[in-house]
């Protein structure tokens, strides 16, 4: 399922599309009704409804209930589906790693701070980071296959006069 979601998201990200703009709107504004979404992205109600149904069919968006404070016809409220996929973030520091996992809505599932690790520009250090990340993933309350992305923040410095960036693990460039 995660591979299908990744493929779908990559496909809608190739060009500006209504489903993509709806996802951006949900990320920025949270739960919304169809009229709010339509106004937020500047397209008609039928176009918004079609794109929303497409996202729901992909399992990325869900109906969460009715808007309670509305007069007249009570509109349905939609939001991102938290279980559509998960993300893992890794932030290496010189003497440790910080790792976190979040759901599709950005809600933190778990995090580990100050995991002992020596950040060096060596293949061994990179392999050790991979092992730590794999252990972290194995201990998550979700299946590995449900993880959409693992992002590692790799520090770098830039020499503006040369227009060159130097980062850790530059032995991979050789």
Question: Language-model features: where?
Answer:
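Glycine-rich phosphate-binding loop and adjoining helix at the ATP-binding site
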Residues: 117-174
């Amino acid at each position: 399922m995660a591979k299908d979601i990744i493929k779908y998201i990559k496909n809608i990200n190739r060009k500006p599309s209504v489903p993509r703009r709806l996802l951006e709107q949900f990320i920025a504004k949270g739960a919304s009704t169809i009229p709010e979404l339509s106004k937020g992205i500047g397209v008609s109600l039928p176009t918004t409804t079609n794109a929303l149904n497409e996202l729901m069919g992909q399992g990325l968006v869900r109906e969460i209930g009715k808007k309670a404070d509305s007069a007249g016809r009570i509109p349905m409220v939609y939001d991102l589906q938290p279980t559509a996929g998960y993300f893992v973030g890794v932030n290496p520091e010189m003497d440790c790693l910080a790792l976190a996992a979040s759901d599709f809505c950005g809600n933190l599932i778990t995090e580990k701070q100050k995991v002992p690790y020596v950040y060096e520009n060596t293949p061994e250090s990179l392999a050790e980071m991979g092992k730590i990340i794999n252990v972290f993933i194995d201990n998550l309350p979700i299946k590995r296959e449900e993880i959409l992305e693992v992002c590692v923040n790799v520090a770098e410095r830039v020499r503006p006069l040369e227009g060159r960036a130097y980062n850790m693990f530059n032995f991979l460039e050789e």
